Amino acid sequence: MFTQLKRGRTAAMVFLAGMTVSASAEAQQDDRLSIHGSATIAYGKSDRLPVTGITKDGTSDYQILALQFGYKISDKDRVVTQLLHRKIGSSPLNAVTPAIDPVWAFYEHRFDNGLTVKAGRNPLPRGIFNEIRYIGTLLPLFRVGNAVYGETLEFVDGVVLRKPFDLGSDWSIDATLFGGGYDLKAQIPTSTGVSVVNTRNENTVGGQLWVNTPIDGVRVGAFANNYMSTPSATLPEAQRPNRTTTFLYSAEAVFSKAFARAEYTTFKQTKSPNFVDFSSYYVQAGVNPTEQLTLVAEYNDGRNMVRFANTPIPNLALPLNQDVALGVSYKPSAQVAFKLEGHRVEGYQFDTPVPSVIVPTAPPLVARLAPAQRTYYGLLSVAFSF
């Protein structure tokens, strides 16, 4: 099984490389064809527990490769396809991650009034980083805002409409609406261990609004999405989940020598047996002492409510991981970045089950948390793009 999986990953990388060479030759003959690629290759090692695919043994099987093809049909029309190969060390999420994932495949038309319409498999307009989080040269860390972005929600299959509005006095807004469906993959700690979620949400409608302030680089945003979990219609009515709404709030200030960002997300499903009550956030700040050097600190946190169905035991807030990260990035050019980062992780969201909830067996019937686990890990990576 391991050999077959390794061969599949190797074949995927060879396939992407072959497509790049072939497409590059064609691009030289047709200036309407554009090709962009990015890769981030890393080595990680933890001191105790496995986390985000990084083990005590260390792993170099840690990479993100993205290859994007665009074709300009006219001045107002284009098509874009992006292929993604991702390997996250020994993470349980590898089991639900394809070797090659066509994360984007859309047609785009721009109207004279500034309205843009995309149809197909579109980038999901969600938060600060969602549309660029696999381009390592644009990120201060290997991954950013892991508590909010995770390893999912890259796309929406459907339609996306975007339009900017000038409000005057240097204020403006960017408004986006979308509808369709998308995959949801996540790794969530529960009272009994680690749960890998791999579901499909359909009949979703949502939008995002960015407010750009007169201060250059400062903006605030909000994202909302109402969706139906599947299966639904094929289930007995009493078992069908309610529609769920998820929210994301963002704030960003980026200047020439410093930056600060924060995002918070939450969603809730109150109907049994699909009870979910989840929230998480991150804050990030950094400085750029020189054009090539970036120093960054980031804190991620969140919680998942544990419900003890059919018992008098009250719900319990199960913390996720409190992740404190410090990193340094050196960019000799805009296309290359070398990064070194260290993380202190404390909580219950690891790649192997850890004791989390102590269920009461006698009065008082109040559950309590087991002692939180802690581990440290480091990542050394190189990112390049073209």
Where are these regions (language model features)?
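Small-residue packing motifs within transmembrane alpha-helices
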Residues: 13-14, 217
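Outer-membrane beta-barrel biogenesis signature
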Residues: 14-58, 230, 332-336, 383
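Short, small-residue-rich loop/turn micro-motifs
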Residues: 39-45, 83-85, 123, 226, ...
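Outer-membrane beta-barrel pore domains
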Residues: 50-55, 94, 105-110, 130-134, ...
